[in-house]
From Swiss-Prot:
One of its GO terms (molecular function) is ATP binding. Mg(2+) binds at residues 21, 23. The keyword Signal does not apply. Keywords: ATP-binding, Hydrolase, Magnesium, Metal-binding, Multifunctional enzyme, Nickel, Nucleotide-binding, Nucleotidyltransferase, RNA repair, RNA-binding, Transferase, tRNA processing. CDD domains: HDc (cd00077), NT_ClassII-CCAase (cd05398). This is Multifunctional CCA protein. Its cofactor is Mg(2+); Ni(2+). Magnesium is required for nucleotidyltransferase activity. Nickel for phosphatase activity. Catalyzes the addition and repair of the essential 3'-terminal CCA sequence in tRNAs without using a nucleic acid template. Adds these three nucleotides in the order of C, C, and A to the tRNA nucleotide-73, using CTP and ATP as substrates and producing inorganic pyrophosphate. tRNA 3'-terminal CCA addition is required both for tRNA processing and repair. Also involved in tRNA surveillance by mediating tandem CCA addition to generate a CCACCA at the 3' terminus of unstable tRNAs. While stable tRNAs receive only 3'-terminal CCA, unstable tRNAs are marked with CCACCA and rapidly degraded. Comprises two domains: an N-terminal domain containing the nucleotidyltransferase activity and a C-terminal HD domain associated with both phosphodiesterase and phosphatase activities.
Amino acid sequence: MRIYKVGGAVRDRLLGRPVTDIDWVVVGASAEEMLAKGFRPVGADFPVFLHPKSGEEYALARTERKSGRGYSGFTFHASPEVTLEEDLIRRDLTINAMAEDEQGRLTDPYNGQKDLEERLLRHVSPAFAEDPLRVLRVARFAARYAGLGFRVAPETLELMRELSESGELQALTAERSWKEISRALMEDQPQVFIQVLRDCGALAVLMPEIDALFGVPQPAVHHPEIDTGAHTLSVLLQAALHQQPLSVRWACLLHDLGKGLTPEEEWPRHIGHERTGLELIKAVNERFKAPRECQELALLVGQYHTHGHKALELKASTLLELLQSFDVFRRPQRFEEFIAACEMDARGRLGLESRPYPQADYLRGAAEAARKVAVQPLLEQGFKGPQLGEALRLERLKAIKAYKEQHAP
């Protein structure tokens, strides 16, 4: 029995990055031997065991053979005769196909170290094209390591393009796709994930609503970058630079989908894109079964982001309607995330990344003014039921009007 540290732990140590999760592969052992040593089986599809003390995952060396469509269409074979090299060749990228023994000696049969030095994301073997999920994984790694100068090797991008055209991407489950998408959006440069998917044709298959934004112009006076797709990528980058949560990043990605439906004769204006984009946002949300908080925020940001930008011009009644749409008195955090998404949208414009966004504090102030209205005096005046709700609305409206007068430009 020989035990090796494999994959990301080896890669990140060589890159000088923090190592969080460690995966181990066991060569020359059977499942019975692992059980005899106190390891606990957890793998449903192939032999994976938890270490009796550390709880880390140990997998028996295995080979795999394509036997059906999609991510799960594989037959696995694990036995003591499977070599380390045979186990490593089934992995996606050369930089993930290195192993270290217990003395720290490196095994690198597919030149992963060379590709690390050359900053290349390169597939290990032609079998890469058998697993459509790898298109998303490579794009995610590109987003993670873009800051270190990594790029996808041309021949790997070509394989990804073939996979995108094969129909295999449609076999991916919503859950597997969302897991990769959500992880990619939380990387330091999530816009690279979208760009790589576009470069290989996968974006047009998985998220055609976003792909359709590229080449659609916006008014240069508001958007010096002009292209709606380029703007979306910039907004996503700003969300990452400002360390926004997943829900905000997802909303930033989807906020302008309606612009892809604007007839060409109306370009570069996009009147009503907030409303026309809602069905598209719903479709993308449902396609990937995004978490409820991500779905809700994406729809609200899509519908109301222009309100956010025009906050200082809105009537008091419109401001109150906006606050009520977000259920701000019970869910203040969601309104904060809306403000954040609006600010990222404003900053995602060429040359305007550092421009102040006074709308943010103005919206917070309006919400706070309305929140300070007390219910108890209205109860003491005898209001109840629907009359109480209307009286409370009028008092909040009065408070917002006073706030507007105090903060008039």
